[in-house]
Regions:
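Trp/Phe/Arg-rich N-terminal binding region typifying the photolyase-homology
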Residues: 2-252, 498, 572, 580-588
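Glycine/tryptophan-enriched, flexible segments
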Residues: 5, 10, 68-69, 220-421, ...
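Short, flexible loop/turn elements at secondary-structure junctions
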Residues: 76-80, 176-178, 204-207, 229, ...
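Soluble or luminal CAZymes and related metallo-dependent hydrolases
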Residues: 126, 130, 181, 295, ...
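Active-site-proximal binding-pocket segments
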Residues: 346-537
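Residue-level detector of alpha-helical secondary structure
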Residues: 91-95, 133, 302, 370, ...
């Protein structure tokens, strides 16, 4: 993208993605956002970055004097659901203290936004569980949490201003969400607030190093991870105060706020049990609550387990990450051996912190500070030679994918980063093989174990995410957007930037991708990641009696005897087909 490119008026034209899912019902009726932007529309958005427009809108009013109003509002979103180390919340609290006004927190449940980003019922239930805990904590500080549900999404900016008017606020603070639709929404909020004599402030919080900092000398965004990571780490170490210092926790309101004419009623509000169109059945709700306990305290405990205890085979599957029995170790904790064991799926070799990061229940800054405390160093270890450094690199990947989302927003509009691959001929998204993939009935044990793990736990080890994704795209030759959507709808840690980045990497269509001719062999991946087949036995019980290499690739006779499906595609033939179609996009 050329920064000095002539700005174009974005077209509203879109191209429908084949085999759209059924519309998601909401309180305002049916709403189906599944569209793919045209190449021209996406290019126009790339040439006029929404984040830059939002920052310009906020910066243009930075010195404006606005009357104090009756309170100060912090607008919490589903990516910053915490009280500790929350930049916008800290700023709102500081303003409230300076002006001697109460602090009010608002939260807007927007079903159409959830549908637009393919949020799943598990993610929404996790959001609600965390909101209830936040409400209790805020209540102890005499800070009301006002939760409302709003549709349609197109009128949400005006609704935000109406909520400010309702509580008598003239100033609001929120952390930036980097998706295109959300940035456009917040630009509108700024514009309406200005017309109404209010000020809406939006600040960076999600990333460790915010988008736009670790960029090339000409100001353009990196599309390759390695140079980004080197600059990211150097910047982080050179300016630790700016990027790593924790934000202050909010100060409590005076208890008299409970008798305030406008604000007192807000304490009586509740968090809904569910959101229409995103309900979980009772069994799944209980299961998710066990596997993924809510709250900041739970998130900190999950992180501490990763930093201080050894991995355990019994923790590989659907279990509470805080289960009893973890053995503490300084030298052999999961993070210390992360570099060697991170690709093994037969134990809890990774942090399991992703659901908490995706919902902002813990800050990424806190994660980095914890590694520094562990090393006892004044510098952040981001190298490849230590387990700690390798894990910090994963946090850098998270920032990298957000940077890509900001610098090349077309990737969040259904477009491949490498545009020539928009013409690849895919098989249909509703072919029987797609259902087999989703259900874990492909005849490839490692793929089936991974897909069944998603259905059971709402989570999947990153190595298996790559393996199952590449199988769908390269072996079945199914559009990567079909899988991207399925992951978002079923994973409790669904994050647009990371999910899109991962899928486009596997599909060879994205930034810093796997070359199109690099195609995982599921059998070899299985032997490397799950050598003894323990993970497969956990999720594919039909094969639990098998041992040795047979569990990775059972013969047709064995599969038939055990009631396990035969492979739905021959890997060698599928590989040749994929290479042929990627080599000449548009030809079959």
């Amino acid at each position: 993208m050329t920064r000095g490119a002539k700005k174009q008026r974005p077209s509203t034209a879109t191209t429908e993605l084949p085999n759209k899912r059924k519309p998601t019902p909401t309180s305002s009726g049916k709403f189906d956002p599944i569209k793919v932007a045209t190449r021209e529309n996406a290019a126009a958005v790339d040439a006029n970055l929404p984040l830059e427009r939002l920052l310009d809108a906020v910066g243009s009013r930075a010195q404006d004097v606005v009357e104090d109003g009756e309170c100060v509002v912090y607008w919490m979103r589903m990516q910053d659901m915490r009280i500790e180390d929350n930049r916008a919340l800290a700023l709102a609290s500081a303003e409230a203290q300076k002006t001697k006004k109460p602090l009010v927190v608002i939260y807007v449940i927007s079903p159409q936004d959830y549908a637009a980003h393919d949020r799943g019922a598990r993610r929404i239930d996790f959001m609600l569980r965390n909101l209830r805990i936040i409400k209790i904590k805020l209540d102890e500080m005499h800070i009301p949490l006002h939760v409302v549900t709003h549709s349609p999404r197109s009128t949400l900016p005006r609704r935000i201003i109406s909520l400010l008017s309702l509580v008598g606020a003239h100033k609001s603070y929120a952390n930036i969400e980097y998706e295109v639709d959300e940035l456009r929404r917040d630009i509108q909020v700024c514009e309406i607030a200005k017309k109404d004599g209010m000020k809406a402030t939006f600040v960076h919080d999600k990333c460790i190093v915010e988008p736009g900092v670790a960029v090339k000398k000409d100001g353009s965004y990196y599309a390759v991870y390695s140079p980004f990571q080197r600059l990211w780490l150097a910047t982080l170490n050179d300016y630790q105060g700016r990027f790593l210092d924790p934000s202050s926790e909010p100060a409590a309101n005076h208890k008299s706020v409970r008798k305030h004419e406008k604000l007192g009623e807000l304490f009586n509000g509740t968090v809904p049990d569910s959101v229409e169109g995103f309900e979980l059945d009772e069994d799944d709700r209980k299961k998710m609550a066990e596997y993924w306990p809510a709250g900041e305290e739970a998130a900190l405990l999950v992180l501490d387990r990763f930093l201080s205890t050894k991995s355990r085979p019994e923790q590989a599957g659907g279990v509470n990450p805080l289960s009893q029995g973890a053995e503490e170790s300084d030298k052999h904790s999961r993070i210390q051996v992360y570099g060697d064991e991170r690709d093994r799926i037969n134990a809890d070799t990774t942090s399991r912190i992703s659901p908490y990061l995706a919902s902002g229940i813990i800050s990424a800054r806190r994660c980095v500070r914890s590694t520094m405390k562990l090393t006892g160093s004044s510098k952040v270890d981001g190298g490849r030679n230590t387990g700690i450094g390798r894990w910090v690199q994963e946090l850098a990947w998270r920032d990298f994918y957000v940077s890509v989302l900001v610098g090349f927003p077309r990737v969040s509009m259904g477009r491949p980063f490498i545009e020539k691959y928009a013409d690849i001929v895919w098989e249909g998204g509703d072919i029987p093989e797609v259902r087999a993939w989703k259900e874990g009935r492909t005849g490839y044990p490692i793929v089936d174990a991974g897909m069944r793990c998603i259905k059971e736990t709402g989570w999947l080890h990153n190595r298996l995410r790559m393996t199952t994704a590449m199988f769908l795209v390269k072996d079945l030759m199914v559009d990567w957007r079909v899988g991207e959507r399925y992951y978002m709808q079923n994973l409790i840690d669904g994050d647009l930037a990371s999910n899109n980045g991962g899928w486009q990497w596997s599909a060879s269509t994205g930034v810093d991708p796997a070359p199109y001719f690099r195609i995982f062999n599921p059998y070899l991946q299985s032997e490397k990641a799950d050598p003894e087949g323990d993970f497969i036995r956990m999720f594919v019980p039909e094969l639990k009696s098998l041992k040795g290499k047979e569990i990775h690739n059972p013969s047709a006779a064995v599969a038939k005897r055990l009631g396990y499906p035969l492979p739905i595609v021959k890997h060698s033939e599928a590989k040749d087909r994929a290479i042929r179609r990627f080599k000449t996009p548009g030809e079959k």
